[in-house]
């Protein structure tokens, strides 16, 4: 996949740069986390933004897709193109291929539904909030990749294909009674979400992803995703 991003994707989209960086790390750990914006993408289990708990020890390749796309800054291809954070796949047995987008909200899962405004115009861009934005990011990422014939062929060989929205709920840092109450409120909503999703995330309907042969799942941090299903 790394070579495909270095060679086939640029060729397909008519991109010309002598050096193309593809941020990548791998692990054979059964349990690990991914974190966006850290020095490393793969971090200790429970310490990142999404947790993986695997049933089979194989080499897992993680690609920082957002970082890769940012490397094309200044091109018409990159400008305005939605993207997810990570590509995660079983590099040995082709067991799974995952597109992961990470997000967060303060206090309550309800805040994930708040409309998102366009920073330039102030108009509502995503009426459905982060739920809608993440879905759009995953759909556009999938379409961008599958438009490249060799990448589509590479993706099709995997047994399980998943688009995964992962999120973390945070509390405000003020150490007062109001903040403590908000943190209690956050814990309660995590418990509600746990009942909704279980340990493998909620299975959602998304025609734009399902039509491409991908499951669409949503999971809260604190609960683990099993890539093998």
Predicted regions and their residues:
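Basic, amphipathic N-terminal segments that precede the first structured/catalytic domain
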Residues: 1-81
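Sequence/structural signature of beta-propeller domains
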Residues: 72, 108-120
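Short acidic, S/G/P-rich loop/turn micro-motifs used as interaction or catalytic elements
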Residues: 75-78, 94, 105-109, 173-178
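Catalytic centers of nucleases
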Residues: 80-89, 134
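Conserved catalytic cores of phosphodiester-cleaving nucleases, focusing on short active-site segments
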Residues: 86-88, 96-107, 119
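Short, solvent-exposed secondary-structure capping/transition elements
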Residues: 95-99, 108-112, 147-155
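Catalytic cores of nucleic-acid endonucleases
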Residues: 118-170
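Short, low-complexity, polybasic intrinsically disordered segments
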Residues: 166-229
């Amino acid at each position: 996949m790394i070579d495909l991003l270095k060679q086939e994707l640029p060729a397909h989209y008519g991109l010309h740069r002598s050096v193309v960086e593809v941020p990548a790390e791998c692990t054979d750990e059964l349990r690990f986390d991914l974190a966006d914006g850290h020095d490393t993408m793969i971090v200790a289990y429970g310490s990142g933004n999404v947790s993986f708990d695997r049933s089979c020890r194989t080499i897992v390749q993680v690609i920082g897709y957002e970082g890769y796309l940012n490397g094309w800054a200044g091109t018409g291809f990159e400008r305005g193109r939605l993207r997810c954070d990570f590509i995660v796949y079983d590099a040995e047995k082709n067991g799974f291929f995952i597109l992961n987008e990470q997000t967060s909200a303060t206090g309550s899962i309800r805040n994930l539904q708040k409309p998102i405004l366009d920073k330039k115009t102030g108009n509502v861009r995503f009426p459905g909030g982060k739920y809608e934005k993440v879905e759009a990011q995953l759909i556009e990422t999938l379409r961008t990749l599958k438009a490249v014939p060799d990448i589509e062929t590479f993706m099709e060989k995997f047994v399980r294909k998943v688009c995964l929205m992962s999120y973390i709920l945070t509390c405000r840092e003020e150490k007062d009674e109001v903040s403590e109450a908000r943190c209690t409120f956050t814990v309660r909503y995590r418990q509600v979400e746990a009942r909704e999703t279980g340990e493998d995330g909620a299975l959602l309907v998304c025609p734009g992803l399902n039509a491409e042969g991908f499951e669409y799942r949503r999971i809260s941090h604190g609960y683990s995703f099993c890539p093998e299903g």
